[in-house]
Amino acid sequence: MHKSVQDIVNMKKGKKKVSVITGYDYTLASLCDKAGIDVLLVGDSAGMVMLGYENTIPVTMDQMCMFTEAVSRARNNALLVADLPFMSYQASIEDAINNSGKLIKAGADAVKLEGGSIMAETISAIVDVGIPVMGHIGLQPQTTMLSQGYKVQGRTKDSAMQLIQDAKELEEAGVFSIALEMVSHEVAQIISETVSAPTIGIGSGVNCDGQVLVVQDLLGMYDKIKPKFAKRYMNLSEDIVKSLEDYKNDVESNTFPAEENWFSMDPEELKKLREQIGS
């Protein structure tokens, strides 16, 4: 039985930190689940990491459903949350509910969407139809990246007060958790102490109730963007490139495949074949 939304909520009550990994494919998600990660997040960052887009804007619902289906087949233990991509929920509450339902049908247990107070009514409507929602405030890649760029949020009193208000209104709307992206660590701590919903930090300091990293960042597999907050636990890209170079050299030198890598005929059958074809 995999973790439930209530299990994640209870972790904050029990003062236990929540581990979240963003992943997009069956193979790596299987390993994350095996490692005991609490939450698997299928992020719209798949657009950059898996599809090579410059940002998350082009990601579609069909793509998010595909990635969600792949990860859902891999998990046995973790809670599965999936991102609603750009313009899948902003235009109308009806869109938000319908598209949230698509992600649930694809295997998600909950959805995540960006936005503060302005999205409270939408979140409430999604929750009212029985779909759990994770909020996302601070840096919001779908929107703030278009206007403000990649900047830390909550460094002034006014911006901090707005973030705190956003968090309170999201909690009132019914979110079970709130992602805080690139929020100053002082403000992230205040929010974490103010709301009962677990906060999940993305570059927002150690005092959040949990943390999230993209698995490719953690493993050192994605070099296009290297955010300050992404700790690398290994540099797998170097090992992968070296292994591929070794394979190429083995092919060129005719040392791969070796005898243990191929299959053979029965010697008597081979003899008959050679006699028949005259070789």
UniProtKB/Swiss-Prot annotation:
Q: Return one GO MF term.
A: 3-methyl-2-oxobutanoate hydroxymethyltransferase activity
Q: What is this protein called?
A: 3-methyl-2-oxobutanoate hydroxymethyltransferase
Q: List the InterPro entries.
A: Pantoate_hydroxy_MeTrfase, Pyrv/PenolPyrv_kinase-like_dom, Pyrv_kinase-like_dom_sf
EC identifiers of the protein: 2.1.2.11
Q: Which UniProt keywords apply?
A: Coenzyme A biosynthesis, Cytoplasm, Magnesium, Metal-binding, Transferase
Gene3D superfamilies, A to Z: Phosphoenolpyruvate-binding domains (3.20.20.60)
UniProt function note: Catalyzes the reversible reaction in which hydroxymethyl group from 5,10-methylenetetrahydrofolate is transferred onto alpha-ketoisovalerate to form ketopantoate.
The reactions it catalyses are: 3-methyl-2-oxobutanoate + (6R)-5,10-methylene-5,6,7,8-tetrahydrofolate + H2O = 2-dehydropantoate + (6S)-5,6,7,8-tetrahydrofolate
Q: What is the lineage of its organism?
A: Archaea, Nitrososphaerota, Nitrososphaeria, Nitrosopumilales, Nitrosopumilaceae
Q: Which cofactor does it need?
A: Mg(2+)
Q: Which PANTHER family match?
A: 3-METHYL-2-OXOBUTANOATE HYDROXYMETHYLTRANSFERASE
Could you tell me what the cofactor note in this record states?
A: Binds 1 Mg(2+) ion per subunit.
Q: In which pathway does it act?
A: Cofactor biosynthesis; coenzyme A biosynthesis
Gene Ontology cellular component terms for the protein in this record: cytoplasm
Question: What does the sequence similarity comment in the record state about its family?
Answer: Belongs to the PanB family.
Note the superkingdom of the native organism.
Archaea
